UniProtKB/Swiss-Prot annotation:
Role description: GTPase that plays an essential role in the late steps of ribosome biogenesis.
Protein name per its UniProtKB record: GTPase Der
Residues in EngA-type G domain copies: 4-167, 176-351
Residues bound to GTP 1: 10-17, 57-61, 119-122
Entry binding sites for GTP 2: 182-189, 229-233, 294-297
One GO biological process term: ribosome biogenesis
Keywords: GTP-binding, Nucleotide-binding, Repeat, Ribosome biogenesis
Gene Ontology molecular function: GTP binding; ribosome binding
Length: 436
């Protein structure tokens, strides 16, 4: 099920990006003491006391020629639309400002849970200054310091109290859930309609007609599926409507609910940098992946065109070397019937479980074929391996020193596992662990 979403909202230069980086544990956002320095939305996963969530740094959205308060209003409205909980960030050094009050008015009308944070309270003497923030109407203000990491535990405790209860989606466990992700107008909704044989999803030539994820139950040859069609992911800076600002987040939430992710490309336009970024989301999710090249009917081709396009995909998406590629046309429905069997295959691979004795035979054969690497005179020793998870298949390899497992040798082991067991369309995770 989708993780809860926290949005950090506030006027520029209250420290949203610093707090975001503290929560996710790494420096993802650019942080400078200049209002509006965070130029785009930053998304990341966080965890607090066994609560997993997604978090958005909304700092400095579309900083440009628009009036200052309009920027704030757009930022808050977008966060309201997507978030389950909003952290309203203010600056204790500045006190309550007119801009804070503008944000508060919008959030107060939202009926979304709001946790009020007063940042830059860097020492105990400043705590008495936070009481003015009660006037914003959101109850107790939580004093925090992004610079020193103070008060974040209490803040996240309060935010977690407002996370929605996890509910099952009502579909059978055997139902295969697959999502379609890609740039606007690559034909995702047309592909859904081609599979269903009806105009289930509104389709037009306007990029981004599908505004949100739409679930569609679907049955074929006695098997049940749920198709999750997502709003297109736009290249940053091109679109300013608030309904588009979190299309990436919507797609990420759809991916979380999926067993299989279809990365849809436009065969007519070819591959652009945004496609690579979108494909990266699919790979990072650990879901099974199929690359779909749509609009193949519109491509001028000969007997070498498909092979050349496939080689281009492999060059751009080296991290998805395991993903099968399907060429089709949603418009003419040519080859669309080949897609479902591929989805079945990668979903099955995603769930493969290997017996420990069989797994170790393959690992030891691999070591005999290609001896383990050495570093500073020490050789990697692999004692045994075991599979600890599926979706994706995850293996723990017990070794003398995890630092000796070089990524190139890890890749070699993954390739041997693929050759032995298939694993079509699914990533493989290998975790090196020292033997006690």
């Amino acid at each position: 099920m989708p993780k809860p979403v926290i949005a950090i909202v506030g006027r520029p230069n209250v420290g949203k990006s610093t707090i975001f980086n503290r929560i996710v544990g790494e420096r993802v956002s650019i942080v400078e003491d200049i209002p509006g320095v965070t130029r785009d939305r930053i998304y990341s996963a966080g965890e607090w006391l066994n609560h997993e969530f997604n978090i958005i740094d909304t700092g400095g959205i579309d900083i440009g020629d628009e009036p200052f308060l309009t920027q704030i209003r757009q930022q808050a409205e977008v966060a309201i639309d997507e978030a389950d909980v909003i952290i309203f960030m203010t600056n204790g050094r500045d006190g309550v400002t007119a801009a804070d009050e503008e944000v508060a008015k919008i959030l107060y009308r939202s009926n979304k849970p709001v946790v009020l944070a007063v940042n830059k309270v860097d020492n105990p003497e400043m705590r008495s200054d936070i009481y003015d923030f009660y006037a914003l109407g959101f109850g107790e203000p939580f004093p925090i310091s992004g610079t020193h990491g103070l008060g974040l535990g209490d803040l996240l405790d309060e935010a977690a109290q407002h996370f929605p209860k996890i509910e099952e989606d009502g579909y059978d466990e055997d139902t295969i859930r697959f999502s379609l992700i890609g740039r606007p107008n690559v034909g995702k909704s047309s592909l859904v309609n081609a599979l269903l044989g009806q105009e289930r999803v509104i389709v037009s030539n306007v990029a981004g007609t599908t505004r949100d994820a739409v679930d569609t139950p679907y049955s074929k040859d006695g098997k049940d599926y749920v198709i999750i069609d997502t709003a297109g992911m736009r290249k940053k800076g091109k679109v300013y409507e608030s309904t588009e600002k979190y299309s990436v987040l919507r797609a990420l939430r759809a991916i979380e609910r999926s067993d299989v992710v279809l990365v849809v490309l436009d065969g007519e336009e070819g591959i652009i940098e945004q496609d690579k970024k979108i494909a990266g989301y699919a790979h990072d999710s650990g879901r099974a992946v199929v690359i779909v090249v749509n609009k193949w009917d519109a491509v001028k081709k000969d007997e070498k065109t498909m092979k050349a396009f496939e080689e281009n995909i492999r060059a751009h998406f080296q991290f998805l070397e395991y993903a099968p590629i399907v060429f089709l046309s949603a418009k003419t429905r040519k080859r669309t019937q080949t897609l479902i069997p591929v989805i079945d295959e990668v979903n099955e691979s995603h769930s493969i479980r290997i017996q420990t004795n069989v797994l170790n035979d393959v690992i030891m054969d691999a070591v005999a074929m290609n001896p383990t690497p050495t570093h500073n005179g020490s050789r990697l020793k692999i004692f045994y391996a075991t599979q600890v998870a599926v979706k994706p298949p995850t293996f723990v390899v017990f070794v003398n020193d995890p630092e000796l497992l070089h990524f190139s040798y890890e890749r070699f082991l993954k390739n041997r596992l693929r050759e032995s067991f298939g694993f079509v369309g699914t990533p493989i995770h290998i975790i090196a662990r020292a033997r006690d």
